[in-house]
Amino acid sequence: MIYLSIIFLLLDVLFASIKKKSLVTCVSECWYHIKWAHYVLLSLAALMMLPMLDYTPGNWQFLAFFACAALLFVATAPSYFERFEGRVHSASAILCAACAIAWAVAVVPVALIGCVLLIVAAFDRKHRLIWLELSAFATAYIGVILLK
């Protein structure tokens, strides 16, 4: 299931980038290009990450839960330019990234190798946010794969 989550996330970014004809600046921008498909793909990516709960020791399961739940909120409040929806979206995105990275630090520190994408972010200033987001996703995915 974790591999399906990775595929759904990559399809989301790929479809939006193809439609935009360049790399999107952030995962959330995908909604403005592929609308309902972004909602479906990001929601499926979040739901397929729920096995994180099974592989996580009891003390840290709340981080896995909040990362998945926050990603569902990001998917259901995609219009980040609107006032209320943007606040929900931004708070959920920050919570998702923070919980995913905190989970990796607490449960599988070697998964932080996913943060290697931060090096790309340092050089590609135009697309910095997408690289930061993909780094957080990669860290969580690597952690789950290593725990399996």
Give, region by region, the residue ranges found by the protein language model.
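Transmembrane helix interruption/hinge and helix-loop junction motifs
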Residues: 1, 55-60, 101-112, 126, ...
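N-terminal topogenic module of multi-pass integral membrane proteins
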Residues: 1-56
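Hydrophobic alpha-helical transmembrane segments of polytopic
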Residues: 4-8, 41-44, 63-70, 96, ...
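Transmembrane alpha-helical segments that form the membrane-embedded catalytic/substrate-channel core
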Residues: 10-19, 73-80, 119
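Juxtamembrane "helix-exit" motif on the non-cytosolic side of transmembrane helices
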Residues: 54-56, 76-83, 122-126, 146-148
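Membrane-proximal helix-loop-helix units in multi-pass membrane proteins
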Residues: 61-114
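Terminal transmembrane helical module of multi-pass membrane proteins
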Residues: 108-148
